[in-house]
């Protein structure tokens, strides 16, 4: 008589990328738990349902609230999130159990297929003045306006496939996406340019937590924590908690122009770069810190300290203006800036 398998319930968004990410998580967990059956519960969140409003206008928790309701009702045991979609302060009773090893956290340029096939444009610097760049991220638009003031930025919503189709068929010359999603879905060949903090990379810092997956559990659920613990990547968790501390201190949600870049130097030195850019790209406050970091608490203290320094140097003024715009409604539509 075969041993009855225990069932562990996983919550996720129902996009193709979210389901692919859950598949990767299950494939990594299964060898550690051969007698566990992982059952996936996929649902649409507010961000999935509303494909017309700009992301900033939808507020915080647009990718997570419905899933967390399932978690707290004990309908699922843990949720697989893109860490960058999670608010920096979780609802009471929720906890990040583990963070997985980070995929490449950078942003990338995907050119219109016609331009790529002709070899006409290979980077943002090649694009003519007035070229249209698709992005729904104020962080991406603000940073790129700083370096490429002649480009026009226009909202583009939808999943990866939808956005690439819009890029190819509509009036966009290129779109900006996270590398991690393209790599996980096997669309590597669409990447025309990698963006990072270097001059060649367009001076672009990525989103807080970008490229990492986080598993949210109920506070105190040690049983589920033990199940998912094999996937915890300590260096990624420490680095991303430093990034999240920056955003939490500056009171920025995922729809504000805060960019970060973390890198381990040697065995235990963490380098953290942060930029806060005005929506028109004309003002910015930048900072960086390098410290020996061995714990999450040290990482969070490092992020908080750097954020407080940036706030004193003008970052808070920039973010206050952004938040006033959100409160008044409509000021954060990408193409209107």
Swiss-Prot record:
Keywords, comma-separated and alphabetical: Heme biosynthesis, Porphyrin biosynthesis, Transferase
Modified residues (S-(dipyrrolylmethanemethyl)cysteine): 254
Pathway the protein acts in: Porphyrin-containing compound metabolism; protoporphyrin-IX biosynthesis; coproporphyrinogen-III from 5-aminolevulinate: step 2/4
Swiss-Prot/TrEMBL catalytic activity: 4 porphobilinogen + H2O = hydroxymethylbilane + 4 NH4(+)
PROSITE patterns in alphabetical order: PORPHOBILINOGEN_DEAM
Enzyme Commission numbers on file: 2.5.1.61
BP term (GO), one: heme biosynthetic process
The keyword Lyase appears for this protein: no
Record text on cofactor binding: Binds 1 dipyrromethane group covalently.
Class of this enzyme: transferase
One annotated GO molecular function: hydroxymethylbilane synthase activity
Note from the entry: The porphobilinogen subunits are added to the dipyrromethan group.
Family, per entry: Belongs to the HMBS family.
Stored PANTHER family: PORPHOBILINOGEN DEAMINASE
Protein's UniProt name: Porphobilinogen deaminase
Organism whose genome encodes this protein: Neurospora crassa (strain ATCC 24698 / 74-OR23-1A / CBS 708.71 / DSM 1257 / FGSC 987)
Encoding gene per record: pda-1
